Amino acid sequence: MWRIYPRLRDRWRGLLDRRLSDPTVSVWPGPAPQPPARAYVPPTERKRFYQNVSISQGEGGFEINLDHRKLKTPQAKLFTVPSEALAIAVATEWDSQQDTIKFYTMHLTTLCNTSLDNPTQRSKDQLIRAAVKFLDTDTICYRVEEPETLVELQKNEWDPVIEWAEKRYGMEIGSSTSIMGPSIPTQTREVLTSHLSSYNMWALQGIEFVVAQLKSMLLTLGLIDLRLTVEQAVLLSRLEEEYQIQKWGNIEWAHDYELQELRARTAAGTLFVHLCSESSTVKHKLLQE
């Protein structure tokens, strides 16, 4: 059985304070952002300004309504998603906010904004190439040579994931103790490229988001393919850090916060991938407190 181990990562927050008077709702401050990032960095928070959240079907998909105003993206596009299930999930994010809207907890909304606005203007092929490139620096392919206890830990916990991926997708991966990492065969890249090509643009945005959290394409594949749970994937991605924490200790509250936050982001990204692969119809749904 795979054991699960606990990666600290930095987070940045912005500020937001803007009045709304338009029949469409854009809750993002200032001009449309153009950062060289994979996804928008959401503003921090603001006072809740709506009471009811609903979804409805429009010509381009499913829309989110805050009271009687339609939600918009940071670039002032109508916030429209491709499936009813995703619309319900996003609406739930907005409906679950209390007196204060905490944008940094609304990962599905952020991913939708990124997919709709595509701030970095990347094509499907570019998204796929970026995802495949993660194999070159995949966390579980990089191994240490010492201490022996960590060497054994990596072998016991990470090797089963690699073996599963090799068998599942019919590709060769391997691992290495070299700083250059393992040599990934061209055929492996082609197989992974072909697999990722089966996903639409929205799902690819979600895949890249999850890979960025876990620093591992292989763990992401295992998670999306239901071979791993979110908890397993997250803690396997933190294997070496957890080893060091067990040996040297840690600041408990900081460790717990980062772990829970990483789980939330990873879970949201994974859910986003699956929901973006679904399609359905809806007449009108109202979500009320």
UniProtKB/Swiss-Prot annotation:
- What keywords appear on the UniProt entry? Chaperone, Membrane, Mitochondrion, Mitochondrion inner membrane, Transit peptide
Cellular component GO terms held in the UniProt record = cytosol; mitochondrial inner membrane; mitochondrion; nuclear speck
Q: Which InterPro entries match?
A: ATP12_ATP_synth-F1-assembly (IPR011419), ATP12_ATP_synth-F1-assembly_N (IPR042272), ATP12_ortho_dom_sf (IPR023335)
Q: What happens when the gene is disrupted?
A: Essential for embryonic development since it is impossible to obtain homozygous Atpaf2 knockout mice.
UniProt xrefs under PANTHER family: ATP SYNTHASE MITOCHONDRIAL F1 COMPLEX ASSEMBLY FACTOR 2 (PTHR21013:SF10), ATP SYNTHASE MITOCHONDRIAL F1 COMPLEX ASSEMBLY FACTOR 2/ATP12 PROTEIN, MITOCHONDRIAL PRECURSOR (PTHR21013)
Subunit structure, as described in the record: Interacts with ATP5F1B; involved in the assembly of the F1 component of the mitochondrial ATP synthase (ATPase). Interacts with FMC1.
Task: Report the sequence similarity comment from the record.
Answer: Belongs to the ATP12 family.
Query: What is the designated name of this protein?
Result: ATP synthase mitochondrial F1 complex assembly factor 2
Q: Which organism is it from?
A: Mus musculus (Mouse)
